[in-house]
UniProtKB/Swiss-Prot annotation:
<dbReference type="Pfam" id="PF11392">
    <property type="entry name" value="AllH"/>
</dbReference>
<dbReference type="InterPro" id="IPR021530">
    <property type="entry name" value="AllH-like"/>
</dbReference>
<comment type="similarity">
    <text>Belongs to the AllH family.</text>
</comment>
<protein>
    <recommendedName>
        <fullName>Uncharacterized protein YahE</fullName>
    </recommendedName>
</protein>
C-alpha cells in the first residue's frame, strides 16, 4: 500500500498510536501520548493538515478500531499485516495566504457573503434540528444564541474569548456544528493582513477554555484554522475571495460542502459570517 501525499506534520510522526475511527474513505489514528489525531484519506480527497492520502479508492475491511499503529523510518504498520510504504510520498505544503490592506478594501465582502448563502440550502444550516427531542431542540436553540453572541463579540471587539469558549462543543458528531462554524469564521477573520487578525489570541484563549467541552478532533481542527491550516479546497476558495474571483465560487463551495456529513456546510456558514463581519472592519461596501 502506497502513500501519495502527506503534510509535514504527518511525515514527521514517529512512535505508536491506534486506530480511533474507521470510515469508508477515511481513518483517524489517535496518538494519546501527544493528544494528537492523524488521518488517512483515500486518493479522491484533497490534502489536509495532519493527513496522508493513500493510493486507494476505499478502506473496506482494511482497518479496525483499536488496531495498533507504528510510525517509523520504514513507513507505517497497522495491526499485524498492513504496511503503508512512505518512500514515494510527496510532501504537501499548505499554501500561504496573505492579504494586503489594498486587497482587503477592494474585496466585495457582502457579495461573498451572499454567494456562499446562495449555495446553502435551508436544511444545511447549523444543526437545524426540527424533530421532537427536547434535548436537541434546546441544543439547537443554544447554538444559534451562542452564534449571535460570537458575532456580537467580534463586532464589538470585546468578550471574544468568553463567547468562543461558550459556543464550543454545541452540536452533535465528531466535529460539532459550533466548532465547524468557528473554524470557518477563524479562517476568514485571521487571514494574514486582515484587520481582525489582532484578535486571534482572543480566539485562541477561547479555544483553550472551551476545548474540554468538545472532541479532540474538533479542537485540533479549530486550532489548525487559527494557524491558517485547513483543507486544500478551502484554501483555494479563500484565495478566490482574496483576489475577488467569484467565477470559481460554485465549484469551490460544492467541494467544501462535501466535507463530512455537514461539517463543510457549517464551515461555510462561519466563512459567510466572517465575510459579513469584514464589512465592519472597513471592507468594500459595493455589493
Amino acid at each position: 500500500m502506497w502513500a501519495l501525499t502527506a503534510d509535514a506534520d504527518f511525515l514527521a510522526q514517529r512512535g505508536q498510536g491506534q486506530v480511533e475511527q474507521v470510515f469508508a474513505r477515511a481513518v483517524n489514528i489517535a496518538l494519546p501520548a501527544r493528544q494528537q489525531l492523524l488521518t488517512l484519506l483515500c486518493e479522491e480527497y484533497d490534502n489536509a493538515p495532519n493527513s496522508c492520502r493513500l493510493a486507494l479508492t476505499h478502506f473496506d475491511d482494511l482497518f479496525r478500531h483499536g488496531d495498533k499503529v507504528q510510525f517509523d523510518d520504514q513507513g507505517i504498520t497497522v495491526g499485524q499485516h498492513l504496511h503503508i510504504e512512505m518512500s514515494r510520498c510527496r510532501r504537501w505544503l499548505s499554501p500561504t495566504l496573505q492579504m494586503t490592506a489594498v486587497n482587503f478594501h477592494l474585496i466585495a465582502w457582502l457579495q461573498w457573503h451572499d454567494i456562499i448563502h446562495q449555495h446553502l440550502g435551508e436544511n444545511e444550516t447549523l444543526f437545524n434540528y426540527r424533530g421532537d427531542n427536547p434535548f436537541y431542540q434546546a441544543l439547537n436553540k443554544e447554538l444559534h444564541i451562542k452564534r449571535r453572541a460570537v458575532i456580537q463579540a467580534v463586532n464589538d471587539k470585546q468578550n471574544i474569548a468568553s463567547a468562543v469558549a461558550s459556543m464550543m462543543g454545541l452540536g452533535i458528531g465528531l466535529t460539532p456544528s459550533a466548532d465547524d462554524y468557528l473554524t470557518g469564521l477563524a479562517l476568514i477573520l485571521f487571514i494574514p493582513g486582515h484587520p481582525a487578525e489582532k484578535y486571534k489570541e482572543e480566539f485562541y484563549l477561547g479555544l483553550q477554555r472551551g476545548k474540554n467541552n468538545t472532541t479532540l478532533l474538533s479542537a485540533i481542527t479549530l486550532e489548525a484554522a487559527l494557524q491558517q491550516r485547513c483543507r486544500e479546497n478551502i484554501h483555494r476558495f479563500i484565495h478566490n475571495i482574496i483576489y475577488d474571483i467569484p467565477g470559481n465560487a460554485t465549484q469551490a463551495i460544492e467541494k467544501i460542502k462535501h466535507i463530512g456529513s455537514s461539517s463543510g456546510c457549517d464551515m461555510l456558514y462561519g466563512m459567510a459570517d466572517g465575510c459579513a463581519l469584514s464589512q465592519t472592519y472597513g471592507g468594500n461596501y459595493v455589493s
